[in-house]
């Protein structure tokens, strides 16, 4: 067996410098001033109106309104995420993603989904106390459909390279 010393001397070493992780992102104010940026902000505002108007009613009594809520809340959250990505120029950190095509597909699918949600909403507006809420949500649903259709058009132009692309001049082609 080995003998262990009665005393042990220890030393305190200096701590390693702490490392921080930072993402340097710049806010693209030009995107906010562009037509696609204005459309995206309008889609977020109108989408919020659609789902809050329906959520303020007893929507669980009409099954079709569940679909409208699903579409409106899902696309509202995805639009907010897209706004953050484009506003902070985070898409430039992912050059392998074909952003013009992604935007074209997103907006086209969103327009189609909102069209189905509008039809379901408009077909189920009952008379009575909540008629105003559901009628207004149907109106804003078709407005949202038109906004997403307009965004699809600008995304198509950006994808084809025939004009300003879907996120101003910031999306790499």
Swiss-Prot record:
GO terms for molecular function: structural constituent of myelin sheath. Pfam families: MARVEL. Residues 1-34, 89-98, 160-173 are cytoplasmic. Expressed in the posterior midgut. It is found in: Cell membrane; Myelin membrane; Apical cell membrane; Recycling endosome membrane. InterPro entries: MAL, Marvel, MARVEL-CKLF_proteins. GO terms for biological process: digestive tract morphogenesis; endocytosis; myelination; regulation of endocytosis. Residues 56-67, 120-138 are extracellular. Main component of the myelin sheath that plays an important role in myelin membrane biogenesis and myelination. Plays an essential function in apical endocytosis. Plays an important role by activating the Notch signaling pathway, which is essential for cell differentiation and results in correct patterning of the intestinal epithelium, particularly of the posterior gut absorptive cells. Forms oligomers. Belongs to the MAL family. This is Plasmolipin. It comes from Danio rerio (Zebrafish). The gene is pllp.
């Amino acid at each position: 067996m080995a003998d262990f010393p009665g005393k042990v001397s220890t030393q305190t070493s200096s701590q390693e410098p702490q490392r921080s992780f930072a993402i340097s992102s710049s806010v693209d104010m030009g995107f906010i001033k562009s037509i696609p940026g204005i459309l995206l902000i309008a889609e977020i505002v109108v989408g919020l109106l659609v789902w809050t108007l329906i959520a303020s009613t007893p929507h669980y009594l009409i099954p079709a309104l569940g679909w409208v809520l699903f579409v409106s809340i899902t696309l509202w959250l995805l639009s907010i995420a897209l706004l953050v990505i484009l506003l902070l120029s985070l898409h430039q950190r992912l050059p392998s993603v074909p952003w013009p095509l992604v935007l074209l597909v997103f907006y086209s699918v969103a327009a189609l989904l909102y069209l189905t949600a509008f039809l379901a909403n408009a077909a189920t507006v009952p008379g009575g106390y909540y008629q105003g809420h559901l009628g207004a949500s149907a109106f804003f649903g078709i407005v949202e459909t038109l906004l997403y259709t307009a965004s699809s058009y600008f995304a198509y132009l950006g994808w084809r390279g025939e004009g300003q692309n879907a996120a101003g001049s910031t999306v790499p082609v």
